[in-house]
Amino acid sequence: LQQYPIKGVIWYQGESNAHNMDAHSQLFRLLVDSWRTNWKNPQMPFYFVQLSSLNRPSWTWFRDSQLRLMKSIPNTGMAVSSDYGDSLDVHPTNKQPVGERLGRWALNQTYGHGVTPSGPIYNKVEREGDALVVSFAYGDGLRTSDGQSPRCFEIAGEEGMFYPAQAKIEGDQVRLTSPEVKLPRFVRYGWQPFTRANLVNSDGLPASTFRGDTDSIITIINSCCTMKSDPKKQYSNIKTISGFPAGEAGYDLGVSACYGGFIGDYMVVAGGCNFPEPGKKKYY
């Protein structure tokens, strides 16, 4: 196919990768990079379809992973299709709207037409008192697809227990509260394998499944650890970890050989705790 010039790529993602999103995230990057290399076009547009809705546990995580891929790979776009999913059929039958959504990305990003390319894309979340305020790109005219209150938003505090949130649309933002969560920190939306989430923008295009945090991973780690970092090697020596009683049974002195390496959105930690006899050596 390399002998034929192409303007860009549209990719309909199948379900076979959904069981291993970590492998897929690497393979998908490789796919995009290799095609751009083979066609000698490092900016070649690559637009793809997000997995739809189906009652399989991994699909929620996979959809979120695809959103993160779109944000991290330049000149890509993602067509959300969860609103056309079938809880029992892995192959939704209504493909025309999905094709039209791919076309919006191409018209806007590749051909310069003034059409809205996407539904609301999660941008950031901030805490205001007992509420979380979520901001979106492509969030002009936020509303719901069925005229009901926004649903499928959940928030959690420091402990990570999620509760359904009361959602109020405010311009291009959504304000979230829950009587169960006094100091919210985490948010997620459409976090069901088969979701009936209903947030759309003025063009009627649906928002993607997403999860977010009020703090970056660096802020989170710094809040619970004392670290010494080497930016060249991208590692951190964890000196102490909060929660170990200082001076009691050598807990704080027992943290040894800890390593933290940042790989994209992940932090890999390895090491051990040496506890005095008759304690045991523990790894985490």
What are these regions (language model features)?
Residues 1-220:
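Cell-envelope and extracellular/periplasmic
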Residues 221-284:
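Kelch-like beta-propeller repeat domains
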